[in-house]
Amino acid sequence: MNRDLEAYLTKCRDQYYRGTPIIPDEVYDRIVENTTGEFMVGHDTEHRFAHPFPMYSLQKVFSGEDTPPNYQNKAVIATPKLDGAAVSICYVDGIFHDAMTRGDGKYGLDISDKLKHIAPRTLSMGKTLFSGLRQITGEIVAPKTIKNARNYAAGALNLKDVEEFKRRDLTLVVYGIQPYVGEYWLQDMKMLGNWFNVITLGDYNEFPKDGTVFRVDKYSYFEDFGYTSHHPRGAYALKTREEGVVTKLLDVEWNT
């Protein structure tokens, strides 16, 4: 791979993780598939903070092309895969502590000043607050009636003007909590529905989607399937390949 191509892909990846992609997501995903192992892209961790729990990606399974994982008759839950910007929100003893962009899954940008206007300040059950640290993960989404809704949502997280962020038509939909509370993921989603919009309690047809997520419901089984460095094996995203997607980037010519 020549250096110009590597530099271009590095730029694409950096912009992708910042939520301001310079090429369509589907094209970026295909480029990554075709160049895996050819080069390593580093990320500047300055001004970024570590997630208490990694925010893994999902294995992509393309309909008609790939074979889905075999979960050995374990109960599996299907939910829509919303197309927005992934975030994490941390609560300490039930009180909002901070919020971050997904970033590269290990490190994200602090967006506490914005998310505190969307996420609840406390998570209490009666007079009891959750003890210890809980990391809630979810998606910031915008209505699909907005042009380039994903970029609209992701771009909002990079705004310096909090008042402008508050004026944007954005919704937080959550789909995860760590450490786990109950024995089943569906059980925890029902609990989180006391405070949040959760992925299991609506069809969310007003928001853009880019597939369907399937995951093993019982946490012990989910963990038994293990993880790769990229994704949990107990879940995957079923997607449809868009027509006209570029399948391989061969070279880059720079305008001079």
Label each PLM-derived region with a short phrase.
Residues 1-256:
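RNA/tRNA-interacting regions in translation and RNA-turnover enzymes
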